[in-house]
Amino acid sequence: MNSKLSLSTKLSSNGKTQLAEYFAMPPFKVITLPSYDDAWANGLNAMQMSSSPGVLAGDLLEIDISLAKLTALSLNTQAFTRVQAMNEGDSAMQTTHILLAENSRLFYLPHPLVLHKDSVFKQKTLIEMDEQSELIYGEIVAIGRVLNDERFAFRQFSSHLKIYALQNDGKKRPLVSDCIQWLPSKMNLTALSQMENYSHQGSLTYLNLAKNNAEIKQQVQALQQQSAEEKDLLIGISQLNEYGLMVRVLGCRAEQIQKLFEKIGRLLKSV
């Protein structure tokens, strides 16, 4: 199935973020949520939903998100995304393109991805950021249905994330390039420095083009102190070359990583 979700934002006359354009093909759907107590006072809260039991063989999923100048969007998902079993030679793919205009802010944290036995899933995410924009973007993936004794029973998983800063001359400067490639039949993914005995991996990328390296360093140190209190998680927090940081987490419970990223998101929104 070919499915597409496209949405953009605009600023209302009273300075609040609204949906400007919205288009969704089944199984995608987006609903707006009430405004909660959020550090992004003018922001819009929304939920990305799906009526499908999961990602199936042959699925081509496309997500396009565009934020207008001065708008802020917090986008979550309804439930876990399950990549269902596939015949040999079949696969599914998702491409995501995000464009952040000047002084816009996006928090995007999809629920964890669960890789079922014999599944093949490839995803590519491209994010382009204009001046003074801010991004909090997370990904969480489970190695299988562990309670069903499925551990690394999928065939392949790949995730490519590329983030660029837009420049006045029309060129793009690379900020982040991150690649995960899992081939269980060819890789020892339980080895040291790989997944070891953990079953879930999460990564959270934070970029704020209005902050300098000294300010980012303070945020890294604050998060490192906070993460020391977390139990049963292996957490690494690194400062990027410029404008941001990345959090990488290994754990055994998806909900624990999800709650950690939500907590970090609230902290980053408030500084």
From Swiss-Prot:
Compartments where found: Cytoplasm
GO molecular function: nickel cation binding
GO CC term (a single one): cytoplasm
Entry keyword NAD: no
InterPro entries: UreD
Signal sequence coordinates: none
Entry superkingdom: Bacteria
Keyword field contains Cytoplasm: yes
Keyword entries, A-Z: Chaperone, Cytoplasm, Nickel insertion
Transmembrane portions of the chain: none
Location (main, coarse): cytoplasm
Pfam family, one: UreD
HAMAP family in alphabetical order: UreD
Family in the record: Belongs to the UreD family.
Assembly: UreD, UreF and UreG form a complex that acts as a GTP-hydrolysis-dependent molecular chaperone, activating the urease apoprotein by helping to assemble the nickel containing metallocenter of UreC. The UreE protein probably delivers the nickel.
Role according to the record: Required for maturation of urease via the functional incorporation of the urease nickel metallocenter.
Name used for this protein in its record: Urease accessory protein UreD
Naturally occurring in which organism (per UniProt): Haemophilus influenzae (strain PittGG)
Gene: ureD
